[in-house]
Each structure stands twice: as structure tokens, then as C-alpha cells.
Amino acid sequence: MEKKHIRPAASAFLLMVTMSLLSTALSFFVGPVCEDMGFGRGSFTLYYSLMVATGAFSVSFLGKYMNEKGVRNIILVSAVWCGVGFLGLSFCRALWMFYVVGAAMGFFGTSCVYLCANITVQQSYSARDASMVMGVVMAGSGIGGMVWSNVVPGIISSFGWQMSYRILGVCWFALAMLSWLILGKQDLSGAVGKAGAVASSGKGVFRTGKFFMVFSVACILTMASCISQQLPSLLGGMGYDAAQVGLMVSVMTAFVAVGTVLEGLCCGKFGVVGTMISVTVFYAVGYGMLFFPGMIYVALAGLAFGSGSLGTLLPIVVRHVFGGRDYAAVWSMIMTVTSITSFLATPVWGMVYDVCGNYNPALITMPVLLGISVVLLMTLFRKKT
């Protein structure tokens, strides 16, 4: 691969590492901040929910801008915006201050940065190459998460939570600016349209049957991925002790990192149709294997590969079905849908346990929904063909 072709991938990879500052590093501040300020953990973490909510709102508008103007301006804004946001968190002294700063950061935070990375890849590579590159790029969030998980607790212990927020602000600004510099002054706007099929432009695409099918598949995959928040509790209820649960969660995290790369490679080699359907079937099998203790690692692999497909394969499906012209608009809308679905579905998993005393109703329902998702994908790809 030529140097000029490596730059977009390297830039997108760095953006995913940057994104992990919000998705992973912030979780280590919950204990220190709540203990120091006397906040309840549930009340305090609401600021992160607000961050996610405003991010879901903003990407529905940013996608169209990125498709027309490219992503460099948005990366630059995010570098400054969230860098200052981290600084603002360090000066918060009341819950409402955290809520305001968190909500503001969300506009150019996690969802925005992920969208920038995604569109950079889709605009810079052919459909075949984009699938392989996206698998590697998605691993950046996992690698970044592992780094921050080992570094951030020590920083907080040494400097306190206020100074640590400022240090992370500098890290965010530096990484985002490095990504911006590596990307260079490339004219990415409209490039994806040259690589993909031409689709009908405008809001009419959101009223088509194929959009409804992609919308439904995205919702089902997101609902299925919400098991990750309940996984430690689920495994504990199956009789595993804390050490075993910790090991299994770590193994699943490793499966996700490996799975995203493998999915990208398989998509490039065998095509998006077979890969997406196969992974979704494996996802359903993973849920089924949770009822068989001897197959627990097969179950974890299925769950990991399935959840990884949201970020790796679903964007390729959108490009395959809608082509390049509508990609940014459709994908930003799908991101909004998945964010809202996650926001609504996550507490439902907990409610199932509260009402039934176990997760069995959800574990039985999800393979059925994933089966429906497979049927929708087959119909979608047949219509496309």
C-alpha cells in the first residue's frame, strides 16, 4: 500500500484511540469524583448519558456536512472542543456543572469522532479495501482502551481527579491534532461516491424499503450488543466466581479485538453478503450456547464477533446497499438510531432480571430476533443483486 493510502488509515486509527479517552478513560473518574464531592454514582454518571444523547443528536446533522466538505474541519473542531471540555470538567463543583459540560462535549465527542474515522475510511478506499481497513481501524478503540485502563488509574492516584481531567484534555487535543495532520490536505468530499454505486440523493432514501430493513437490522444488532453491560452479572448467576468472570470478560474483549480484524479481512476476501450473514448466524448461536456451560467460550466468541459487526460490517452493508452518494447521510442516521436503541435497550436487560430473577427471557428472545435479522439481510441483498 502506498504511503498516501496509509495516511487515511493511520489517521482513522488514531481517531479511534482518541475516542477511547471518552469511552473508557472517563469510567475511572467515577469513584474518585463521587468520594471527593459526595455525589451518588447514579446521579454523577448521568452526565455521560447526556454526552451520549447529544452525540446521537449531532451526528444526524454532521454526516451531511462531512459528505460535502470532508472530515478535516470536524476533526479540528473536536480537538479543541473536547480538549476544552476536559478542562471544564476539572473545574466542575456541582452536578449540574458536570451535566452541562458533559452534554456540550457530546456534540463533538465519541459519536462524532467515530463518524469521522468511518467516513475517512469509506471516502479513501474502494469497497473491498475499506472493509479490511475498517477492521484494523476499529481495533484502535480496543488498543486505546487497554492503554488508558493501565495508565489513567495511576495518573488519578498521583495527581488527583482535577489535574487528571486536564491531562486527558491535553492527550485528546494532541491525538486529534496528530490525526488531523496525518490526514493532510486531501480532498475527500465526494470521493466515496466514485467508489460506490450511485444512489438516489435526498431525504427520499429514508422512506425506502431497503432503509427500513437496514434500520431494523441495526436495531436488532444493537439490542443484542447490550448484553455486554449485564455480562458479569449473567456469568456470576451461572455459578462462576469473581476471578472466572473477570477472565471471561477479558477473553471476550480479546475476541472483540481479533473479531473486528477478521471480519474486515473476510469481508474483503469473501464479500460483505456472506460475511455479514455468517456473523449474524454465529451471533445467534452464541446466545444459544449460553445455556450450555461447557460451550461458554464458544458463546463468548459468538457474542464478541456479533457485537464487533456493528462497527466493522454494518458500515460496509450501508455502503453496499446505498452506494457512495448517500453513505454519509444514511450512516449518520443509523448511528443516531443505534445510540437511541442502546439508550433504551440497556435498562430493559436489567428490568428483565428484576422481574424474572434471571436473563432467560432475553436470552431466548435474542436468537429469534437475530434470525429475523438474517432473513432481512438475505432479502436486502437479494433486492440489491
What are these regions (language model features)?
Residues 7-41, 58-62, 149, 227-233, ...:
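Extracytoplasmic
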Residues 26-30, 206-263:
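Extracytoplasmic gate region of multi-pass secondary transporters
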Residues 33-34, 65-66, 147-159, 164, ...:
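Interfacial helix-cap and linker-helix signal at transmembrane-aqueous boundaries
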Residues 57-95:
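Conserved MFS/SLC helix-loop-helix module at the cytosolic interface between two early adjacent transmembrane helices
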Residues 58-70, 260-271, 353-354:
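Helix-to-loop junctions at the C-terminal end of transmembrane segments
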Residues 111-125, 309-322:
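Intracellular juxtamembrane helix-capping segments at the cytosolic ends
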Residues 137-184:
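Helix-loop-helix hairpin linking two adjacent transmembrane segments in secondary transporters
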Residues 252-262, 267-317:
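C-terminal transmembrane helical hairpin of 12-TM major facilitator-type secondary transporters
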